[in-house]
Amino acid sequence: MGRKDGENLNSNTMKSRDFNETINGVASTASTECTNQQQWTKYHSKQGHGFAAEDANALWDKMHGKRVDKVGMDNSKNGADRIVNGVEIQTKYCANATKSVDAAFENGQFRYSGMKLEVPKDQYEEAIRIMRERIGQGKVPGVTDPNMAEQIIVKGHYTYDEAVRIAKAGNMDSIKFDIKTQAVACTFACGLSFAVSYCAAKSKGMSHTDALKFAAKQAAKSGGSTLITGVAAQQLLRTHVGRNFAAIATKAVKPIVCSAMNTEVGKNVLTKTASVIAGKQVAGVAATNVITKALRTNAVVNTVVFVGTSIPDTVRLCCGKITGREYAENTASNAAGVGGGWAGASAGAVIGSAVFPGVGTIVGGIIGGIGGGIGASLGVKKMFSFFK
């Protein structure tokens, strides 16, 4: 007979805490990737709302099933910001329609030949009128029909004011945007947690029904935790404190990455890792930048994950439900699980990619993450057991 939900779920059997810590660590890789796809480092600048508009509109397109390539992140002059289903789009979000359209002109001529010009949703009609005038004045090379303005101007999915708010922390527009950004990481955490928890429950003799219930609970916890910490990290990175933290992390990790790149083994490992992270072949300085960027953002994300997952134990400590020693052990184990999960996932993804690109990358990342996270977490607990 299968055991009931609730039986054997203590620390001596299910080890669900170890799984949760590890899954949070593995999921942080997905959360970091979601964060790195945004141009948050530029949100605080004078044109920060423009970069936020690019990110928000690109995300909207992705979530509506369109194929999006954010080619503009390399800041090439007069290049498209993104390519959507093969169509090049340049985004201009200024205070009014005249300024938004004028930003696409240089020396009196339209400088984005063959591209669509995306403007704030609330400026669309006025922008079309202005573009008609520009075409009539011969300022759009290769276009003579004013009615073509409707083919050139694209209505953005957000207003100018919404873009301004998305670039800032602490408001509903930016929080909703971050929730959408972290949806992928949340889904990943839910699926991984469900699978791991179900297998663990079945291995302990639980019935199929009870194992499903247990797995569903764990999936909800992991998904919710990943979503909350991911959003919190993105909100933090919009603040002065968050940017300073990221800058310190960059200064700390870049010399280490550069030193590793100077050795043959380090260069090979980091180049392969960078290629997996970037989703394309990169080398040299580009690989160094990819790794540094990933480590920088992950330091912030993992710190938020660690703090968030440590809150329950902190509350229990303050209420006298656990001892200081238990708190120290749980906290250290938590940190090891999160960090080990991320490190294991990164290493596993590289190995999996080498064996079977695509599927191997995903499977390797999951297996490596679980192994690394649980190994690190149990290692810390073993160390603490020596002092009992």
Functional labels for PLM-detected ranges:
Residues 1-51:
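Interdomain/boundary linker segments immediately adjacent to catalytic/signaling cores
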Residues 29-107:
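Catalytic centers of nucleases
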Residues 96, 120, 159, 205-207, ...:
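Helix N-terminus capping/helix-initiation residues
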Residues 98-151:
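A recognition module on extended beta-rich or small alphabeta surfaces enriched in W/G with H and D/E
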Residues 145-217:
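Cytosolic-side membrane-insertion boundary helix
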Residues 190-306, 312, 330-383:
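Small-residue-rich hydrophobic membrane-insertion segments
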Residues 309-329:
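Membrane-helix boundary/interface segments in integral membrane proteins
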Residues 325, 384-388:
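Cytosolic/matrix-facing juxtamembrane and C-terminal tails of multi-pass cellular membrane proteins
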